[in-house]
Regions:
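Single, function-defining residue in the core of a domain
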Residues: 1-73, 81, 87-90, 95-440
């Protein structure tokens, strides 16, 4: 699957017997999604060992199979639906990222589910007053607790989520001494002041907060944003959030944390674009500008999980084009594809960042690394510029070799190798590895 950078069985299996083997594996009831997920988590835990700080980034995506619904109905009476009542499954992984290098190292959990077409509506369920455990939004708490439990105890864990994760129960249940939250705020919450009988809305409080600093960062093009250097105004305050006045969290004790408000100045905001603006709620101590900017940097790592979804859906793996007939087979394929897509993505990231701290052992076996040494020597040219400049057995070193196998010239004047280059390089590498194993 990694070699052919596809989640479509007919594409990642060359021969008929390979295709039949893949179909039998995915449809084998004795091979569960839980067993595959357990392997992914074990790999992530191994990769996380010895790391001081882990960013555990949550997000949800829809995998839509509406184009194949008739095929699926042959084996499954009701394959389940996602948004817009279309056939599919929800995917909610927690991507674990090393906080110092900003390189992903695996998954601490992956949740998949869909809805019954006969499920009651939010109004019929009286959704606002349902216990949080009965809501789909409980996934944010459940996945946060799993990250806390699965990852090494001595590592600091920061659970990162976008606006959907702004749930009061998350703040009251998850944080410990070394498990922190960094969540983008969306709700207009009440904040308690020194006088317990007085409160003010969070947005009002932050708009009136003292301007702490101005700083800038580069915005890459995409998602309706133009490339630019965004000039930001930074504010932060310690706040005490009051429990909601309605719903299952009503009457809960208030929660004390920090709010970071960062907003782009009009001088750097392009015409017809809204300014970048984030209100981040965090349990990390934020008493200096440096601490606030560091938290913002961690939050900006959310682009990694968004990029992973793009790789999984469009840039090669095409998971929504997989033509399997059962939900269970598709969910197994999604798990396997996630790990394969991550390996391809990390190769490109390691090359782009020129990071020599990450070991290639995370994504390559010892035998594969031995072959990388052999192939790497042959991939180097006669000039200094065509020599692999990276520390041996680092991920950047491996990425340079794979890029060369993918027909990258090693000259800086040539464009940076992309996903297709790394796909082609991996294809050649694993073809050579099959022969290498036979010989050795």
């Amino acid at each position: 699957m990694v070699v052919h950078q596809s989640a479509i069985v007919n594409q990642f299996s060359k021969e008929h017997k390979e295709k039949m083997g893949a179909y039998r594996f995915l449809n084998n009831s004795s091979v569960s999604s839980d067993a595959i997920l357990s392997g992914l988590i074990h790999t992530c835990c191994k990769n996380a060992s010895g790391r001081q700080h882990l960013l555990c980034i949550q997000d949800t995506s829809e995998i839509n199979y509406e184009a194949h619904v008739e095929r699926m109905k042959k084996k499954t009476a009701s394959p389940g639906i996602v948004g817009q009542r279309q056939c599919g499954t929800f995917l909610h992984p927690v991507l674990v990222v090393d906080a110092s290098s900003h390189i992903p190292i695996g998954f601490s959990s992956v949740k998949q589910w869909n809805r019954s077409p006969a499920a009651l509506s939010r109004e019929e369920r009286n959704y606002r007053y349902q216990p949080i455990e009965e809501k789909e939004s409980y996934r944010w708490i459940e996945s946060g607790m799993a990250a806390s439990e699965q990852m090494p105890r001595d590592a600091v864990k920061t659970i990162i989520g976008d606006r959907e994760a702004d749930i009061f129960e998350l703040f009251s249940r998850i944080p410990t001494d070394n498990v922190h939250l960094l969540i983008r705020s969306v709700h207009e919450r009440n904040c308690r002041l020194d006088d317990p009988d007085c409160s003010v809305q969070l947005n009002t409080l932050m708009e009136q907060a003292v301007l702490r600093a101005e700083y800038s960062f580069e915005v890459l093009p995409g998602s309706g944003r133009k490339k630019r250097v965004a000039c930001m105004e930074l504010r932060f305050e310690r706040v005490t959030l009051c429990a909601p006045v309605n719903g299952p969290a009503k009457g809960s004790p208030p929660v004390s944390l920090y709010c970071i408000h960062v907003k782009e100045k009009s001088s750097s905001t392009p015409v017809n674009e809204s300014p970048i603006e984030w209100r981040l709620l965090t349990t990390h101590v934020v008493e200096t500008v440096e601490q606030a900017i560091e938290c913002i940097g961690w939050y900006r790592c959310r682009w990694l999980i968004e990029e992973l979804f793009r790789v999984l859906k469009r840039k090669g793996f095409m998971i929504e084009d997989a033509q399997l007939e059962t939900v269970s087979a598709l969910q197994k394929l999604i798990l396997i594809s996630l790990q394969a897509a991550l390996q391809v993505m990390v190769l490109k990231l390691s090359f782009d960042k020129e990071d020599e701290k990450l070991s290639s052992e995370i994504y390559f076996t010892s035998k594969e690394i031995a072959l990388l040494h052999i192939v790497g020597k042959k991939s180097e040219g006669n000039t200094k510029i065509q020599q692999n400049p990276y520390k041996k057995e680092s991920m950047a070193w491996a990425a340079w070799i794979i890029a060369r196998l993918g027909a990258w010239s090693a000259y800086k004047s040539q464009s940076i190798p992309g996903y297709i280059t790394f796909k082609n390089g991996l294809d050649r590498f694993y073809t050579q590895f099959e022969l290498y194993e036979l010989i050795s």
